[in-house]
Amino acid sequence: MVAILPDSITAETAPYFLPESNNSKLLEFLKPLPFSTIKSQSIPAVVGTQVPVFKSIDVSNLIEKTSNRLIWQTASERRRDDARSTSEELENPENEIEEDPQHFVEIQELLPKSLKDQLSLVVVDNFPNVKQYAIEKIVDSLVDTRKYKWSHVHYEFADNRSVYIRFEHVPDAKWFVDTYSSVLPDILSNKNIKVIHNNHIDEVLDELSDFKADPKSTVNSKVVSKIGSILKNKRNFERISKRSGTEDLDEVLAYYSKYEVDSNDLIDVPTNMREAIVKDIVRFRSKVLLIERDNRKKEIELEREKTKDRLKKLFAGLKETNDDINMDSETTKDLPSNIVNEYDDLSDDEYEELLKTGEKKKLDKLYQDKSHQLQSLETRERLYLTKKLEDLNNYEDDLINNKIKYIEDFKNIEESTNSNNNDISSLVSLYFNNHAQYLKVRNHKRSAEEALDAKDEDDEKKEELSTKSQDFVSLKKAKNTLEKDTEDAVPVADNAESETEPSRIEVDQTSKLQSKIVELVEEYLGIVDEFLVEVINENLNKHNLSAKDELMEELSEVLDDDSANLVNDLWNYVSTIAI
């Protein structure tokens, strides 16, 4: 029960007072109203909260102490809060802007392409799972002003990652290994951290006479403190997904545990069978989801295994480079065992002479190949020019022997030219005056020209067959000469008589001979070379069957060893048709 005190014995007062200087700096900027006569100093300090007190008790001292204590506590708390916020900003930069790393490259760019790339690459395994900009800040703190590039291999479900650092200079890599191999696990607060490097870095640097290694330096406490503050800030860490990849299927399975089949879907099902069918439906769908979940888990596990294998191969690659170093003659002392055993007994002069001999053999082989190509080209060109020269040498004789024919040809050309001019003018006139008659004349002339063309073609074929028949007779005569066992020469009368044999040679035999030549050229060369067929015909026309070796030599430039087979087959064929 609350007792109500009479107003005569109580009064209301503020629990504390505000000083007249409160917000005075702000009030100084405010101009007084032009119609106001009240000064700013005379404005009373009023507190909105009032509490009742007895009039008989003096509470002024208590109010003054309370006001002073509140003012002092407010100022000290404000200073303490400012100091705390400043310290937190220094130690835990929560509002720090995430900048893109300047030295980060894709992992493919760090694949070693030379011995220098292999030696200058350092791998920090089990590096904390921090963001890229945090990794670069940590590495910057460790390497100071040394130039480098870095990348990392990271998997979604892994808590750590592997950081690859390639220094611009090999001595910087050696300095990093010597300085941080043993202390880096303590700096990064992870005992599983390993610094992996190429084991041949010391051997290669020792071979360099002008190399001066950087002395092993001690780790600065400021560096350790800075790295520790980066690792303490949770915002610098990646958010690792704890999802297994099958949560959606698990949710569906949980749904099917409470799944109810709509009765409207089972109208056609007898009542006594509905319960069993509903169970079968739920069991079937659950089984399908379980199979799908198992398959997805297997796929995820397989992907993890592949990622582990890729990491193992990357780590093993540094060890495999040791074998590659042994194959590099510029930077290694040891050679493969088979080469060492072969040239171990040779002196320096003998080994140098051996290298010169090998180089000379290569040059000789190259010279022989080029020379063979040049000779083949020269042979073809010589045959072409020889044939052309013979035609030119025989030009005057041919012109004298056939001068009457050429004179008649010139006369015919002149007469045909004049007649053509007259014919053209008459045809033009006929074209415009009587077009139907013009068409008849044109068709008549066209038929006559076609008949003449057909006749010329038949004459050319007959002439060609006649020439081939003469060639065939010559070949037959040469064969009969070679088959004789005695050295008796063939009488001149027989030769003269044989020259009259073209009339008795059948045309189809000559055609068979030419077909056989074309067939053999296509068989051994792969294509029908008209030039090669012409060379064979020219040899047979000029030497009959007495220049077999010469024909082989000419064909060897193109067919090599197959030239002998082609000539033998041709000679055998001639012997069969010449009987």
UniProtKB/Swiss-Prot annotation:
Residues 88-99 have a biased composition (Acidic residues). It comes from the Eukaryota. The keyword Transit peptide does not apply. One of its GO terms (cellular component) is cytoplasm. GO terms for molecular function: RNA binding. It is found in: Cytoplasm; Nucleus. Residues 292-380 form a coiled coil. Disulfide bonds: none annotated. InterPro entries: PWI_dom (IPR002483). One of its GO terms (biological process) is RNA splicing. Keywords: Coiled coil, Cytoplasm, mRNA processing, mRNA splicing, Nucleus, Ribonucleoprotein, RNA-binding, Spliceosome. Component of the U1 snRNP particle, a subcomplex of the spliceosome. This is U1 small nuclear ribonucleoprotein component SNU71.
